[in-house]
A protein has these predicted regions:
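C-terminal "cap" of GNAT-fold acetyltransferases
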Residues: 30-32, 85, 95-113
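Conserved acetyl-CoA-binding loop-helix of GNAT-fold acetyltransferases
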Residues: 38, 44-61, 76-84
């Protein structure tokens, strides 16, 4: 099922993380896709890295094989964040997203657990 964690400081939510199966169907039950959101004020302070550690640790205990990220090609800091945590770019899907009035590529990244 869907897993969810919250990072807080001084009783305020500063970030959250979740993961769920990459695609429907039993054939994908060992591949998860995650989302991590950290408040701008707390970026580059280790919050995202800590949340990712929790996500991947939890998934690994459940015998999950891989954690996936779908990142907008425009979001270079997020791509670098994932690369710093051993995610590898495995595909780039051209113009599948729409942001800021234009179509954008989706970068698929994977970490083997």
């Amino acid at each position: 099922g869907h897993e969810f964690w919250v990072a807080s400081q001084d009783d305020k939510i500063i970030g959250f993380a979740s993961y769920d199966q990459l695609r429907g169907g039993v054939g994908y039950r060992y591949s998860m896709e995650h989302t991590i959101i950290v408040s701008e004020k707390y970026k580059s302070m280790g919050v995202g890295k800590n949340l990712m550690g929790i996500l991947c640790g939890h998934a690994k205990k459940r015998d999950i094989n891989s954690m996936w990220a779908g990142v907008s090609a425009l979001n270079v800091p997020a791509i670098k964040f994932h690369e710093g945590l051993d995610f590898k770019i495995v595909a780039r899907l051209p113009k599948v997203g729409y942001k800021f009035g234009t179509f954008v590529d989706l970068v698929l990244m994977r970490k083997i657990l």
